[in-house]
C-alpha cells in the first residue's frame, strides 16, 4: 500500500506545475469578485471610519491648540496682573511700615514728653518739699538754738 501512495504522488498531470487550463480564468474572476466585495463591504466602511477618526483627531488637536494658546495668553495675563498686584502689595506694605514707624515715633515722642513732664513735676514737687523741709528744719534749728541759748544763759 505504501508503494501505491508513492506512485500516486509521483504522477503528474500534463502541463507541469503551472497548468493554464479553464481553472485559471475562473480563479482570477473569483479573486476579482472577492476583491470587489471586500472593497465594498469591508475596506470602504473601514476607510470611511478611519477618515472620520482622523478628521475627529485633527479637529480635537486644533481645538486643543486653540485652548492651549488661550491658556498661555491667560497665564501670561495673570502673571502680569500678579506681578502688578505684588508690586502694589509691596508698595502698600512699605507705606504701612512707614506709617507704623511714624506712629510709633509719635507715640515715643509723646511718651517721652509725658515722662519728662512727670519727671519735671516730680522734681519740682521734690524741690518744693525740700524747701518746706529746709524751712521747717531752719525753724526747728532756730527754736532749738534759742532753747540752748536760754539754757546756757540761765
UniProtKB/Swiss-Prot annotation:
InterPro entries, per the entry: ATP_synth_b, ATP_synth_b/b'su_bac/chlpt, ATP_synthase_B_chain
Residues annotated as signal peptide: none
Entry superkingdom: Eukaryota
UniProt KW Signal keyword: no
Coiled-coil ranges per UniProt: none
Keywords in alphabetical order: ATP synthesis, CF(0), Chloroplast, Hydrogen ion transport, Ion transport, Membrane, Plastid, Thylakoid, Transmembrane, Transmembrane helix, Transport
Cell compartment(s), UniProt: Plastid, Chloroplast thylakoid membrane
GO MF entry, a single one: proton-transporting ATP synthase activity, rotational mechanism
GO cellular component: chloroplast thylakoid membrane; proton-transporting ATP synthase complex
Membrane topology: Single-pass membrane protein
Subunit structure: F-type ATPases have 2 components, F(1) - the catalytic core - and F(0) - the membrane proton channel. F(1) has five subunits: alpha(3), beta(3), gamma(1), delta(1), epsilon(1). F(0) has four main subunits: a(1), b(1), b'(1) and c(10-14). The alpha and beta chains form an alternating ring which encloses part of the gamma chain. F(1) is attached to F(0) by a central stalk formed by the gamma and epsilon chains, while a peripheral stalk is formed by the delta, b and b' chains.
HAMAP family: ATP_synth_b_bprime (MF_01398), ATP_synth_bprime (MF_01399)
Name of the protein in question: ATP synthase subunit b', chloroplastic
Organism for this UniProt entry: Vaucheria litorea (Yellow-green alga)
Gene of this entry: atpF2
